[in-house]
Swiss-Prot record:
Signal peptide residue numbers: none
UniProt keyword list: RNA-binding, Transcription, Transcription antitermination, Transcription regulation
Function according to Swiss-Prot or TrEMBL: Involved in transcription antitermination. Required for transcription of ribosomal RNA (rRNA) genes. Binds specifically to the boxA antiterminator sequence of the ribosomal RNA (rrn) operons.
Family affiliation: Belongs to the NusB family.
Gene3D superfamilies cross-referenced by the UniProt entry: NusB-like
Source organism superkingdom: Bacteria
GO MF term list: RNA binding
HAMAP family: NusB
InterPro entries: NusB-like_sf, NusB_fam, NusB_RsmB_TIM44
GO BP terms: DNA-templated transcription termination; transcription antitermination
Disulphide bond pairs: none
A Pfam short name: NusB
Record-given protein name: Transcription antitermination protein NusB
Length: 142
């Protein structure tokens, strides 16, 4: 999959961030290659894939700004809830969506929100999708 569209890049960003969250000793480049070369799973020799610039922007942005993203998201949780109580896929999608909404010059906030909901549809359940929509839509309105 050498040419990635934006939706595929966002899917890959989610997968890389999820992989890094699950295995914190994994090197970033190894996480990128694990995700980007999945279609070569049966190949005898895996050919490394160049990391798309927008993928690197999203992943590095979320990892480097995680504390600020978490601080921005926390006020929108139900009373008594903490980010640590959220399912990891939900939290990763919230961080990724919020980072893109706040920092991408290429995707308007509404597009970033819609893409976050597409990730939620693929990687979480309907209840989580509704929660993610409720939280991130606050940032579109702001």
């Amino acid at each position: 999959m050498p040419n990635f569209n934006r939706h595929q890049i966002r899917q890959a960003a989610f997968q890389v961030l999820f992989t890094l969250n699950a295995n914190q000793s994994l090197e970033l480049e190894d996480a990128y290659q694990a995700v980007l070369t999945m279609d070569q799973f049966d190949a005898e020799e895996v050919t490394p894939v160049e990391v798309p610039a927008y993928l690197a922007f999203l992943v590095s942005g979320v990892t480097e700004n995680q504390a600020a993203l978490d601080a921005a998201l926390t006020p929108y949780l139900k009373k008594g809830w903490q980010l640590s109580r959220l399912a990891k896929p939900d939290l990763i999608i919230l961080r990724l969506g919020l980072f893109e909404m706040q920092n991408s010059t290429e995707a308007p906030a509404k597009v970033a929100l819609n893409e976050a909901l597409e990730l939620a549809k693929q990687f979480t359940d309907d209840q989580a999708k509704g929660f993610i929509n409720g939280v991130l839509s606050k940032f579109v309105e702001a």
